[in-house]
Amino acid sequence: MPFQKMTIDDIPVIAPYFRFVTTNTCDFTVGGMFMWRDYFHMAWQVKDGVLYSTLTGEDGNLYYNLPLGEDIPAGLRQCLTRHPERPVRFCTIPEAELPLVRALPGRVEITEEENFADYLYSAEEMIRLSGKKFSGQRNHISRFLRTCRSWSFEPLNNTDVAEVETFFHTLNKKLNYTPGEAAEENHKVQEVLEHLDQYGLVGGVLRADGAIVGFTLGEVLRDTLYIHIEKADRDYPGAYQMLCRQFCTAYADGLTYVNREEDMGDLGLRKAKRDLHPVTQLKKYTVEVW
């Protein structure tokens, strides 16, 4: 089968290969891969039990993702064989998989993707928010509770989609998005809402006095809850903190980690993610093989 453009109809074929990843990076999840498939012109192929996927970087070059299957080293070597031009480029290679690429023949150049390390948190800490280091988060939640007369958090299902879409459109009118990753994310949020069952994500809706003030979408894979989408109305102080805690309480109970993904170099986002005290950051690397 030749490489083909990635679509949401491919989720049932591609998703089972994520079990071969031994790290908790968000790139090998349904939301992490399929929400960005169009922006990065992603294509895929399965050959001899190995999933190969490619993307076009913002520099215009073709990159391979980490091949997924029973024999990842053989998949990496196959990328070199099928791509005789040099260098052969790989992206978002998890730090734990670097020994595999270092073993490839040729000169291997490795560069850290500093803005794309995932923030990994303790699931228990995200639920409890106990101790001095989380006092700021608890204060934000207390402010949210003082702002509204009543509140609720409930699972997001198909019956909520129309109301969530209305909230999302209203929220976006307050923001001035320019073309790029933020605009693409918003486009894909709409797609996920319209194809909730195909994506198979879990979600939650936060209400204040009956009105939606935030929603989240994510997925559970192995021991980790991945938070792909988190949107809240900042006119309700503390809504983001309340939304995060309730979502983790609903879906991360009994898990080990919560992955809140990367900061993409956004300094405000970086501060917000660091303020939640991650247990570690999962580094990723670009690799060129000459």
Write out the residue ranges for each language-model feature.
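Short, extreme N-terminal leader segments that mark the start of a protein/domain
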Residues: M1-F20, Y285
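Short secondary-structure junctions
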Residues: F3, N24-D27, W44, G106-E113, ...
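Conserved donor-binding loop and adjoining core beta-sheet/short helix segment
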Residues: P16, T22, C26-E97, R207-R234
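Short, glycine/charge-rich beta-strand/loop segments that flank catalytic centers
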Residues: P87-L104, E114-D118
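Short catalytic-loop micro-motif centered on adjacent basic/acidic residues
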Residues: R89-C91, E154, Y257-R260
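Acyltransferase donor/substrate-recognition loop-hinge adjacent to the catalytic core
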Residues: G106-Y177
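Short, conserved active-site entrance elements at the starts or edges of catalytic domains
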Residues: T159, E163-A211
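Aromatic (often tryptophan-rich) hydrophobic motifs at membrane interfaces
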Residues: L201-W290
